Amino acid sequence: AGDILDAYPLPVTGVLRPGVKTLAGLAGGAPLGVIATKASIDSGAFRRELERYGLERGVIYTACPDFVPLIESGHYSPDDALIREAVARYLRPMKDAGVGAILLGCTHYGLISAAIEDYMGAETRLVSASECAARELSDKLRELDMTGGCGEERYLTSGETGDFGRMAAIFLGWQPKRGAEH
């Protein structure tokens, strides 16, 4: 992260910390949950960040390796049988434990938040890591008075540039005018 901050004189916000901070603020009597990709869960990054808030216990971490492929293949409606089955399979231990809040630790997972809420119930708070990061970045830009004027759109992806337009339309609800680059 230091290299990025040194190379670009712009505010940089990661996805992990803002979401974890919000989740930690919801800690109370009920356990908390974190769902993310297998690589993210296995890295221990969420665990280490939550430990900074004194939350060494009472957190259930669950890797959900089927979520991203399902979402990217168009299965994200709360009525979709494949998503409903995957949500139930991965989140059953959290439901049984009575978690009070779940961090959606992957940017894709916001697309299935309705299916997660349907399964877990409205009393379980869902925290979107991507929404928390966007809010933090927006706040930083306002503080630095960098919200006015015109900007330009530039999309960078670590994935396939050919898939970008289709996926962007799903995530954004509109088709970007420009394609993505690596």
Where are these regions (language model features)?
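Non-catalytic structural scaffold of enzyme domains
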Residues: 1-182
